[in-house]
């Protein structure tokens, strides 16, 4: 059995790590490299960095901190934010990132997924999906440019359809960001994640809602995801990564300790 992965997420804005609730009202929580080093030292399996306003503001990730992170940590990490071209992706990988993730640019130009996987291989192409449960229509819908409240907009895609589309185009992994659960620490959306898991032939990473160790256990045991991403519980010291891994191991969840 493949070990489940614990993935701290670092949202980056103007050179600092920030965290919001349901993608709004972001507050500064720390500096990029020290936080990355802390999580690597605590036993994280990999890290994800999102430059949350890069796509909305039509710019790309600052390569300087990417190289500094690569120099300091010895675990895989993924970067996302404003990557629209092969050249931009190549630069981030050259500066030390192991994977690149695209979200809003893929919605604007789905063929970008195919071009990236043809150039670099699908193993390092991650698709982030910001999924919002719409109570009126009782459906899951994909939103775009979510890093900036003023720029956030609806798309024509239902989450299930977009999950199938990005796989057809060659993504190697999917991060499902459940917007309704983000930052509220009430647990992962097991129902939605289970539904998406049934459509996924690639690794699925759950994002949004972690508040307790039991939430991690449930998302692995019930939704069968491959990895669980979380931010605020790690940033605020609510959950220690090594303690979490011991808890998961004691509950028959395979993890690297």
From Swiss-Prot:
Pfam families: His_biosynth
Gene3D superfamilies for this protein: Aldolase class I
Presence of the UniProt keyword Cell membrane in the record: no
Enzyme Commission number, as recorded: 4.3.2.10
Enzyme class of the recorded protein, top EC level: lyase
Pathway assigned in UniProt: Amino-acid biosynthesis; L-histidine biosynthesis; L-histidine from 5-phospho-alpha-D-ribose 1-diphosphate: step 5/9
Taxonomic superkingdom: Bacteria
Signal peptide: none
A GO CC term assigned to this protein in UniProt: cytoplasm
Chief location of this protein within or outside the cell: cytoplasm
Location(s) in or outside the cell: Cytoplasm
InterPro entries for the chain: Aldolase_TIM (IPR013785), His_biosynth (IPR006062), HisF (IPR004651), IGPS_HisA/HisF (IPR050064), RibuloseP-bd_barrel (IPR011060)
GO terms under biological process: L-histidine biosynthetic process
Active-site residue numbers: 11, 130
Reaction catalysis annotation: 5-[(5-phospho-1-deoxy-D-ribulos-1-ylimino)methylamino]-1-(5-phospho-beta-D-ribosyl)imidazole-4-carboxamide + L-glutamine = D-erythro-1-(imidazol-4-yl)glycerol 3-phosphate + 5-amino-1-(5-phospho-beta-D-ribosyl)imidazole-4-carboxamide + L-glutamate + H(+)
GO molecular function, one term: imidazoleglycerol-phosphate synthase activity
Assigned keywords, A-Z: Amino-acid biosynthesis, Cytoplasm, Histidine biosynthesis, Lyase
Function: IGPS catalyzes the conversion of PRFAR and glutamine to IGP, AICAR and glutamate. The HisF subunit catalyzes the cyclization activity that produces IGP and AICAR from PRFAR using the ammonia provided by the HisH subunit.
Family: Belongs to the HisA/HisF family.
PANTHER family listed in its UniProt record: IMIDAZOLE GLYCEROL PHOSPHATE SYNTHASE HISHF (PTHR21235:SF2), IMIDAZOLE GLYCEROL PHOSPHATE SYNTHASE SUBUNIT HISF/H IGP SYNTHASE SUBUNIT HISF/H (PTHR21235)
NCBIfam families per UniProt: hisF (TIGR00735)
Assembly and binders: Heterodimer of HisH and HisF.
Designated name of the protein: Imidazole glycerol phosphate synthase subunit HisF
Gene assigned in the entry: hisF
